[in-house]
Amino acid sequence: METGSPGKRPVLPKRARLLVTAGMGMLALLLFGPRLVDIYVDWLWFGEVGFRSVWITVLLTRLAIVAAVALVVAGIVLAALLLAYRSRPFFVPDEPQRDPVAPLRSAVMRRPRLFGWGIAVTLGVVCGLIASFDWVKVQLFVHGGTFGIVDPEFGYDIGFFVFDLPFYRSVLNWLFVAVVLAFLASLLTHYLFGGLRLTTGRGMLTQAARVQLAVFAGAVVLLKAVAYWLDRYELLSSGRKEPTFTGAGYTDIHAELPAKLVLVAIAVLCAVSFFTAIFLRDLRIPAMAAALLVLSAILVGGLWPLLMEQFSVRPNAADVERPYIQRNIEATREAYRIGGDWVQYRSYPGIGTKQPRDVPVDVTTIAKVRLLDPHILSRTFTQQQQLKNFFSFAEILDIDRYRIDGELQDYIVGVRELSPKSLTGNQTDWINKHIVYTHGNGFVAAPANRVNAAARDAENISDSNSGYPIYAVSDIASLGSGRQVIPVEQPRVYYGEVIAQADPDYAIVGGAPGSAPREYDTDTSKYTYTGAGGVSIGNWFNRTVFATKFAQHKFLFSREIGSESKVLIHRDPKERVQRVAPWLTTDDNPYPVVVNGRIVWIVDAYTTLDTYPYAQRSSLEGPVTSPTGIVRQGKQVSYVRNSVKATVDAYDGTVTLFQFDRDDPVLRTWMRAFPGTVKSEDQIPDELRAHFRYPEDLFEVQRSLLAKYHVDEPREFFTTNAFWSVPSDPTNDANATQPPFYVLVGDQQSAQPSFRLASAMVGYNREFLSAYISAHSDPANYGKLTVLELPTDTLTQGPQQIQNSMISDTRVASERTLLERSNRIHYGNLLSLPIADGGVLYVEPLYTERISTSPSSSTFPQLSRVLVSVREPRTEGGVRVGYAPTLAESLDQVFGPGTGRVATAPGGDAASAPPPGAGGPAPPQAVPPPRTTQPPAAPPRGPDVPPATVAELRETLADLRAVLDRLEKAIDAAETPGG
């Protein structure tokens, strides 16, 4: 066998070389072409939105990581290969029948450089590409600062654990990978070239092979010693005691922590024993040291903590874990901002002591009670305000508030977006889908506390023109008319949640000056986009790039695309924010608002950490279902701040990031990493700030934690006796928890309307009400949490019990049977409202939807009844149930005649007006009169009109209305043929 000279190598013909070269070029193009196209498109898109610096910073960071890791891994592996190759035996017996690696050895000897460099570079590049995903850790390490808070065990600033430690661990992991790969490369190379030979009954190892393998093995063990040292700090995020609490417990501090130090010492001794193999031929010392390390890891690192936990800690857990539970409580409250000045606790009896009309706060609260449910009314909005088949609203509408004529009112709001999935027939042609149908039209709102008329006749509810929202529409048709309740100067919507559902998601807009418009605007007009958004495809190179990206040749050949054309991509507001700020976690629910005459999407964004010492882990995102159907828990965090409010302009797609938490050290770190990307809080316009809502995702995390972390005493925390639970949703059969709800309630100090996100809480493994949590959204008190704590022995019913009490009421049960003959019933939000100076009022709208008799007919929900319930002013825990077509009448039933009418006069009259007569469904109202959305003025309450007189007058008026209803029914019956 020839080992030194490769001999004469065969030469390929010129044509064959050309074919091989062309084939390799095509393969490279197929492998890397799409990625290069994506990189160029990202370059263009980030430049369009003004965040190219973010793209460049992330790219350079990842390239630097690739280069660093690739150099380290490739260098160490190449050095190992080179040493093993140069120290190979000079003579290796060439016996293929006894040496199975002889053919491979011959092949390697022909191209030793390709063998060495090829393996080293390949491993280095692969490791570098994988390591590049750790760019976040690198940026946090480089730009991280301090928190000003030290951990209670080591006395280090929290910044060390969240900014530095993850980086150190990442570096250590890649050094591990490099050294292990070098060890394996050395082992295989020595085996290939005869430095290591395995024969029957024994093996042979040359001195060079022994030294090299011992050095790399010692390096691995030495790195393991460093890992044990870092493990000490990571104990502060230990999950041993979960779900009771997160963080180091008694066993971690008194067994695991000393064990790590012992293992550090043993690992160092073991590494030294491996290094002695450089001078000693006997490998038994390193072998015994390795066995000692493994045995110590099992006994000291595993068995000792296990025995301590089982026989010392668990029998006395309430006492021995007390200081560590206290650490967990303090850290969790700080990490999630559920302690200190951010949370106000108040004792609350749960039983009303006054009439609502005697409490100014209650007058405001009941007047603003929300009857429209954004989860139910999307189809109603779509059917009545759709205008065209290709327009639609989001599956779940949103809730916001607007001050109209000086009065604050909450609205159900939605954007009339283009729905790509609703295009049919020729509308799905490429030109129509991407060039003609490009945008939505208008902002639609409806006062949340009223409908157009009360639905009184249970037998003919579906045929009545009642129970529908009173729409305030701001669209193209109403533009410039002066009749818009919420003025919008640019109602066209090119960016939104629904429009982004196109597959693929892009629209081609723009045209040369003076060219004929092509985009559908209204039935009588077309439009040409003039916004700043979009990537230019006016040159042939960009057109070719996008034709490649979307695999669509029409980018190249369509005459509809000209020199001024642009392509709009990434049209989902949430996606746009995620792309320009990949270091933020976005809320699942962007919502539209009107600011300065423009429709913009507000996206709540969070800074998060997952290594905050002692802080409880929680899931900021809901369960995620994989394509294979496996349900996994969402992103786990141990620190969260709603530090950024982002906006996306619905017309031109402009993304703006605003700082919203000056005290967040994580946001300050990211602002140093990406300077100029986040505007300071001082630059937030007041009109925009007035529409900020407390985000639902954050509130859901906080309420689930407050269920436990309202407890101050560690022993009581351990017993769980004082814990609360998030109630199950009584209107959902899927065993889901009750979602929080936005409400406009009276402020305790001023009695003025205050916009809040709220939730009821029940006892642990009980259904009785235990607490009521609300988060302020008003600018002056934004982020403050108010917790009303009920007595532990309360008999005030929780949401599930109240739901059962209401639907089992004889009036409800009997009429429900009647309604279900021709309707489907939908129960809306079950709202819990503090009222009557200590009581809790439950309000639940009941919607009916006519059962469709044919596949082509469309049906949609309408408000038909309002259920209310309040606890009896006694200690037994009984409840009163109100059930009527209007909130006012339902309140009369539980508080006495006239009470509901007086208390809800600002918002109740419009909802309780008698129906104007039988008729079909309410026709779409493109531009309603501006006054229809205003709450009617409250009745005068001067000294010359006693409350009793007002109540009597209203009761008499209600009787007259009932007589009129009976008279109308009699007239209708007389006019019906055969009647």
From Swiss-Prot:
Ranges of biased composition (kind: Pro residues): 913-946
Transmembrane segments annotated in the record for this chain: 19-41, 63-85, 114-136, 174-196, 208-230, 261-280, 285-307
**Which residue stretches belong to region Disordered?**
898-948
Annotated InterPro entries: UPF0182
GO cellular component, as recorded: extracellular region; plasma membrane
Matching entries from NCBIfam families are given as: PRK00068.1, PRK12438.1
Skewed-composition ranges (Low complexity): 902-912
Annotated localization: Cell membrane
What keywords were assigned to this record? Cell membrane, Membrane, Transmembrane, Transmembrane helix
- Main localization is membrane
From what organism does this protein derive?
A: Mycobacterium bovis (strain ATCC BAA-935 / AF2122/97)
What's the protein called, per UniProt? UPF0182 protein Mb0065
- Membrane topology designation: Multi-pass membrane protein
Task: Tell me which family the UniProt entry assigns to this protein.
Answer: Belongs to the UPF0182 family.
